[in-house]
């Protein structure tokens, strides 16, 4: 537990942040209506209206997650609910280098949502322990290295992080960039190592409440909503009312009966991953079973992913200073900028270190070695060294060098040694989503519910054009500027990139033309079916 002074300080800072997510507004009848500004989801408990119940939550937290159970008439530990697990699917077109063409791949990412009150508990501890983490890495001298999930970076974002890397490459001129991606990072975090680093950050043995958190996040359980629907033959479309909680979908009268039913039917799954992980170099005969994996998506998981690698960050940062290379880590993405003659050695040693000491693997297909060197015209360009080595070439010339051009991709941007661009896949995804939204809007306009004689395009403009606030386009335009104002009205440095501005220059023309085209197509179809006589106005 925290000292009383620490707790009050942490509670004040976190509760002010949290309360901003709740708002009371007037409904159409003029009555007060509660509005949650955070995205909602159905879980085992009802949504928690923080402004009214914050004293209840504060008492639980101040007591170190101990509460009085009226039914049992005893003081007990807080019982964390199972997480709700979903599979987030993202379609992406990826270039298959060996086959020489693009293929559609679907990236599947498991995300775990905590119950509403559990999420607030995780949120408070994440806020409090982040203060401890920030103090620790500042004291140890590597606070500039980890970039993701930070609270003490002066409102910097990926624009500034990427610019720093690209500026470092420009400063060095001839150099190489090594980009590494940790495979399934959250799913492979070793529990013993995590506990060891957690203790190091707070400077003491885990207090009982934090040990309870540690157990909740390493021995976590989860359910799948789809599994519940299939098991109990529930068709959401045929229900008279939307379920208030997941328990409404489970047969039984009392909540404890429903939880028991879920356990008996094996719909509550517990994380019990363990395996014998052998180190290749330091101790090849170590056959100790290692337990691993934490839920990705909980309020604590992001912070723990940084805590896990505190010694890795410190070691690589010290080596970077001694050997004159540049190191940054954004969660599971590692980036090194170094002299080209040292690149291969540094790459191999970092891959070995993270495997031997942290039981993590680097995805081979995502290892990128990009060399920045003058082309035949003396202009610094980015070369794909993996492709060049596979082709058996030690050098390129004016005839073949363009075959090996490949920009460095980092945090949504591309740098070819001369110009900075928005990552091409990000731009493609933006246009794909824009067209999808246009089609959906036009179809709705011509449906039986579309009573107006026009297409409501305000939402499209808000989400997919420069006219909106805080969308992809405004972010990209901010990146293209020399300076811009962020959401807090603070002046921030952009990339001053004419190339990005050129990439975005036709977006509004494409949007308007697509809207007009889809409107015409839908009208002709409806007219042919005898269901429309007049084209909708755009």
Language-model-derived ranges and their functions:
Residues 83, 87-123, 141-153, 233-251, ...:
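Short, conserved non-catalytic motifs in the polymerase core
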Residues 131-142, 177, 205-210:
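Short secondary-structure capping/junction motifs at helix and strand boundaries
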Residues 157-177:
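A short acidic-Thr-Gly-centered motif at the start of a beta-strand
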Residues 1-101, 504-507, 511-538:
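Non-catalytic, polymerase-adjacent accessory regions of viral genome-replication enzymes
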Residues 144-155, 335-338, 368-378:
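Beta-rich nucleic-acid/ligand-interaction surfaces
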Residues 338-364, 384-388:
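Helical (often loop-to-helix) elements that flank the catalytic cores of nucleotide-handling enzymes
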Residues 172-331, 335-349, 402-405, 447:
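Conserved polymerase palm-domain catalytic core
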Residues 115, 119, 123-125, 259-292, ...:
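Right-hand nucleic-acid polymerase module
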